[in-house]
A protein has these predicted regions:
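ALDH superfamily catalytic-core signature
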Residues: 2-3, 165, 198-318
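Generic non-transmembrane alpha-helical segments
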Residues: 39, 43-50, 156, 160-164, ...
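Rossmann-like NAD(P) dinucleotide-binding subdomain of oxidoreductase/dehydrogenase enzymes
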Residues: 98-234, 272
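N-terminal Rossmann-like NAD(P)+-binding subdomain of aldehyde/semialdehyde dehydrogenases
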Residues: 1-106
């Protein structure tokens, strides 16, 4: 599917419309926030099937995995905020020092303004829309930037958002690096980014120009430590599940194992068994085996096979 791209000239216009909408006070009332959260929940339920179908087209992600790892997490977040937004927004009393008597102290939470949310491709529904829940709950507006590597999902999300919220409140902007650059040239009141450390640095540098607060959820490496006293069969099943979920394209998936030398052979045997139980003898035929997102990622993973000994598997099929 061809990538949809927003006209770069519209980015500043959308940003200005959202700032004006926020300053009008339209997002501030807690009852309005709760109503928007309820509308968001209804939208996710309405668009659940198209979202899951798009995840299948882009990533070969099964309905079961799409629901468990994406949609259900989003719905849970929305429902938590619906239940608690009233409590979270109430002023909180704090002790007042004697020197300030007879004054009283409170913490009053106020929305920052317009937020930019940039998400990656590996969990394109959850990682883009879960931060939006916080935006709505806090009384802000938002521009959402989905990944260009999952065009089907990005298009469905854009349609869902347009069907649910006005552009001056929540908008979706699509495109490649030039669009990212144009977005980061704008002044935002909050930036929420999930992705690579290299692009995270660019986000941080752009935010620093205006002292914009940022949340950076960056990728890394996740070791899994298995001691000689561990239940080998259970540990192997958990590692296999964690590494096969989303084909290992998860920031908290086990990246490498640190095993006690006395259990290495037994563990590897149990791990192979666990993978076969999950995906069968030919994972390509499994409906629950997600595909690698693009050619560059495939070639990078293929290169790992040359760096060590292949214990089992090791076949590639581009």
């Amino acid at each position: 599917m061809a990538l949809t791209s927003t006209n770069i000239g519209r980015i500043g216009e959308i940003r200005a419309k959202q700032e004006s909408y926020f300053r009008s006070g339209a997002t501030l009332d807690v009852r309005t926030r709760k109503a928007n959260l309820v509308a968001f929940e209804k939208a996710v339920l309405k668009w659940e099937k198209p979202l899951c179908e798009a995840l299948w087209k882009d990533l070969h992600k099964s309905y079961e995995e799409s629901y468990i790892a994406e949609v259900s997490i989003l719905l849970g977040e929305i429902r938590t905020h619906i239940r608690n937004v009233g409590k979270w927004t109430r002023p909180q009393r704090r002790p007042t020092p004697m020197k300030l008597f007879p004054s009283r102290s409170k913490i009053i939470s106020e929305p920052l303004g317009t937020a930019l949310i940039i998400s990656p491709w590996n969990y394109p529904v959850q990682l883009l829309l879960t931060p939006l829940v916080g935006v709505i709950s806090s009384g802000c507006t938002a521009v959402l930037k989905p990944s260009p590597y999952v065009p089907e999902v990005s298009d469905v999300i854009e349609k869902m958002i347009r069907d649910t919220f006005p552009e001056e409140y929540v908008a979706v902007v699509q495109g490649d690096r030039d669009v990212n650059t144009a977005l980061l040239e704008q002044r935002w009141d909050m930036i929420f980014f999930t992705g690579s450390p290299s692009f995270g640095r660019a986000v941080m540098a752009a935010a620093a120009k205006n002292l914009t607060p940022v949340v950076l959820e960056l990728g890394g490496k996740s070791p899994c430590i298995i001691d000689k006293d561990a239940d080998i069969e259970v540990a192997a099943k958990r590692v296999a599940w964690g590494k096969s979920l989303n084909a290992g394209q998860t920031c908290i998936a086990p990246d490498y194992l640190m095993l006690h030398k006395n259990i290495k052979d037994k563990f590897l045997s149990e791990l192979e068994k666990a993978f076969r139980e999950l995906l069968g003898d030919d994972p390509q035929k499994s409906e629950h085996f997600v595909r690698i997102v693009n050619d560059a990622a495939f070639e990078r993973l293929k290169g790992y096979l040359a760096d060590g000994e292949v214990v089992f598997g090791g076949k590639t099929d581009k």
